[in-house]
């Protein structure tokens, strides 16, 4: 990578300069309470570096998927408040992104202070497919930095988006790679080049369609792919088994069958669960039992049973595969971990990752939320990615606009 780094920017001198930082503050909320502040904590080091160096920092970020206009439930207020609690520098929040509030507060910023601009997705131009519209919004963001500004991309969770605050501002200001993004890319490189073998990939989550491209790219690169989560039922169906009322993407069965055929030629083996936890309905207190994966309809609940977790036999088999690995990448929970009764599979995978001496990477999103919800510490894993979609697209071999624009 030929991108300039944050350390280079600081070496040039940032005291008194406005530095626009794209951070990842897209955190889960329960009302106005942040339920997982992992991304906020991950954003802190770069902001602190710039603050300590005397920069006047303008933070852009998004939260959720507002429809191009302000919505209270997507405000950055809770995230900015949590950032202020964690920081040892002054943090303020503007009531808008490029309006009067942002301009007034930016003008009053002192060296070392941080101003969080309101959710960039409150402006429809942020995500516009029209280059001119995005460019116009980027121009207004850049205008806040005055005549000697710079841009730092520290939001790995957004680098796969060609959005104004990620891509277009980088074409208008001297641009630098934030430490968080730099670390993420270096970690993902270890999963794609010179990977220590055996390389085991654990894939879960609800839909196999979300993982097709990454599976395709991993054939021949990963030694073993362990399949759990809702997507496992499409694999079972592809092998000719009935899955009762479990989540099934029938249109993906031929694709999965093709992958299963190609895998052996490519030197990659798929490991599919041999037992699953089947429930009477989708609820935390649902009746449930463990059955063989090839006999789901033989459960007490018959054809209406719903598979909500991998079974203990499968969890142990997956853990054994992880124990023998030198590199492990995990993306997607094994079951409905939010319900205690169906969290055992996900917990077993997390525990196996903490027990192994292998280099372990937890791909962001639901997997990161799961390990924290289940009581594991970030430090117990080699790396927890802040970008679920971005990490998958990187492993798919796709070009990520937010990274390619920084290469020069």
UniProtKB/Swiss-Prot annotation:
GO biological process, one term: glycolytic process
Record keywords, A-Z: ATP-binding, Cytoplasm, Glycolysis, Kinase, Nucleotide-binding, Transferase
Reaction catalysed by this enzyme: (2R)-3-phosphoglycerate + ATP = (2R)-3-phospho-glyceroyl phosphate + ADP
GO annotations of cellular component type: cytosol
Sites where the protein binds ATP: 211, 307, 338, 364-367
EC number, as in UniProt: 2.7.2.3
Subcellular localization: Cytoplasm
UniProt superkingdom: Bacteria
Principal place of residence: cytoplasm
GO molecular function ontology, one term from the record: phosphoglycerate kinase activity
Keyword Membrane: no
Pathway connected to this protein: Carbohydrate degradation; glycolysis; pyruvate from D-glyceraldehyde 3-phosphate: step 2/5
Pfam families reported in the protein's UniProt record: PGK
Keyword ATP-binding assigned: yes
Binding site for substrate: 24-26, 39, 62-65, 121, 161
PANTHER family assigned to the protein according to its UniProt record, in alphabetical order: PHOSPHOGLYCERATE KINASE, PHOSPHOGLYCERATE KINASE 1, CHLOROPLASTIC-RELATED
HAMAP family reported for this sequence: Phosphoglyc_kinase
Family stated for the protein in its record: Belongs to the phosphoglycerate kinase family.
Subunit architecture: Monomer.
Official protein name in the record: Phosphoglycerate kinase
Gene name of the encoded protein: pgk
């Amino acid at each position: 990578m030929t991108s300039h780094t944050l350390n280079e920017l600081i070496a040039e001198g940032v005291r008194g300069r406005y530095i626009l930082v794209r951070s990842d503050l897209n955190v889960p909320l329960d009302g106005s309470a942040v339920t997982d502040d992992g991304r906020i904590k991950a954003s802190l080091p770069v902001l602190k570096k710039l603050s300590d160096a005397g920069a006047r920092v303008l933070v852009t970020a998004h939260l959720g998927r507002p429809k191009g206009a302000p919505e209270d439930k997507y405000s950055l207020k809770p995230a900015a408040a949590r950032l202020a609690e964690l920081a040892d520098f002054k943090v303020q929040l503007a009531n808008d992104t490029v309006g009067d509030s942002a301009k007034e507060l930016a003008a009053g910023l002192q060296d070392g202070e941080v101003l969080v601009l309101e959710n960039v997705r409150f402006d429809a131009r942020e995500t516009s497919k029209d280059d001119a519209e995005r460019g116009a919004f980027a121009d207004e963001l850049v205008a806040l930095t005055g005549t000697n500004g710079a841009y730092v991309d520290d939001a790995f969770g957004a680098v796969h988006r060609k959005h104004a605050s990620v891509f277009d501002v980088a074409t208008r200001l001297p641009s630098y790679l934030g430490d968080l993004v730099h670390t993420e890319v270096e970690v993902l490189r270890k999963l794609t080049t010179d990977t220590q073998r055996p390389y085991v990939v654990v894939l879960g989550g609800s839909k196999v369609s979300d993982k097709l491209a990454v599976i395709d790219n991993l054939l021949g690169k990963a030694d073993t792919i362990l399949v759990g989560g809702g997507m496992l039922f499409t694999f079972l169906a592809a092998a000719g088994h009935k899955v009762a009322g479990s989540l099934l993407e029938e249109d993906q069965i031929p694709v999965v069958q093709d992958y299963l055929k190609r895998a052996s030629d490519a030197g990659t083996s798929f490991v599919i669960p041999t037992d699953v936890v089947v429930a009477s309905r989708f609820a935390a207190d649902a009746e449930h039992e463990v059955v063989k994966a090839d006999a789901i309809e033989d459960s007490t609940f018959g054809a209406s049973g719903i598979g909500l977790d991998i079974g203990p036999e499968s969890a142990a088999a997956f853990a054994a595969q992880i124990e023998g690995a030198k590199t492990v990448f995990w993306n997607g929970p094994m079951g409905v971990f939010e319900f205690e009764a169906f969290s055992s599979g996900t917990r077993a995978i997390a525990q196996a990752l903490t027990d192994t001496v292998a280099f372990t990477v937890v791909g962001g999103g639901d997997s990161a939320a799961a390990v924290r919800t289940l009581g594991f510490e970030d430090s117990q894993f080699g790396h927890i990615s802040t970008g679920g979609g971005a990490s998958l697209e990187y492993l798919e071999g796709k070009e990520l606009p937010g990274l390619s624009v920084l290469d020069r």
